[in-house]
Amino acid sequence: MEKPKYNRIVLKLSGEALAGEQGNGINPTVIQSIAKQVKEIAELDVEVAVVVGGGNLWRGKTGSDLGMDRATADYMGMLATVMNSLALQDSLETLGIQSRVQTSIEMRQVAEPYIRRKAIRHLEKKRVVIFAAGTGNPYFSTDTTAALRAAEIEADVILMAKNNVDGVYNADPRTDETAVKYEKLSYLDVLKDGLAVMDSTASSLCMDNDIPLIVFSIMEEGNIKRAVLGEQIGTIVRGK
């Protein structure tokens, strides 16, 4: 069996990653592909926690920009992440991978409430744990959720899977042909240069708790496994 570099990971999936090329909604083919990749690493005895965004269904900031109360818009976004999490859970269990959804906002008919010790126990039993509903508080992104949960469960790394870029660049590679991709960065570089990796709250939390971050493309099948095995893909962010 191949030996993974990391034993306990947090996989951060953007909502857009679940939409695939259609841009919004949940693409069943894409979510099945992601579930198969998660199965690959679960079979290496890696403990897998997942944080899913909700941008394929709703963005709190968009609602706020249109005049909605920001807190209400953010709560709607949290509910969108629950829908995505349940879809991912279903795909995983179709493949025979036991999983649990834990929500920051209680909805016991749908999922377990988030309890740190229980989440760790699930991971130790090799169940995939999907953290839904963000932090349970408005004004905090799902990037911050990933950083917070990674600190709480003492994860070895955060794998940030992107659907539109394969790492961190000094400019937007979709609009600037001269954009240069970084292989390694520090969190101070990210904060100082305002690089679009994750928001500053999440970056600070990762830096303060010394949690490495790997940013890579989800669109190339097998990349999650490559990252877990320690292959050089995407961009790694760590330290001060």
UniProtKB/Swiss-Prot annotation:
Activity control note: Allosterically activated by GTP. Inhibited by UTP.
Reaction(s) catalysed (UniProt annotation): UMP + ATP = UDP + ADP
Residues noted as binding UMP in the record, renumbered to the chain: G54, D74, T135, G136, N137, P138, Y139, F140, S141, T142
Residues in the signal sequence: none
Pathways involved: Pyrimidine metabolism; CTP biosynthesis via de novo pathway; UDP from UMP (UMPK route): step 1/1
InterPro entries in the record: AceGlu_kinase-like_sf, Asp/Glu/Uridylate_kinase, Uridylate_kinase, Uridylate_kinase_bac
Residues the entry annotates as binding ATP: K12, L13, S14, G15, G55, R59, N163, Y169, D172
Annotated localization: Cytoplasm
GO biological process, one term: UDP biosynthetic process
One MF annotation (Gene Ontology) recorded for this entry: UMP kinase activity
Keyword field: Allosteric enzyme, ATP-binding, Cytoplasm, Kinase, Nucleotide-binding, Pyrimidine biosynthesis, Transferase
One term under GO cellular component: cytoplasm
EC number annotated for this UniProt entry: 2.7.4.22
Keyword Cell wall biogenesis/degradation: no
Protein family according to the UniProt entry: Belongs to the UMP kinase family.
UniProt subunit comment: Homohexamer.
Function noted in UniProt: Catalyzes the reversible phosphorylation of UMP to UDP.
Protein name: Uridylate kinase
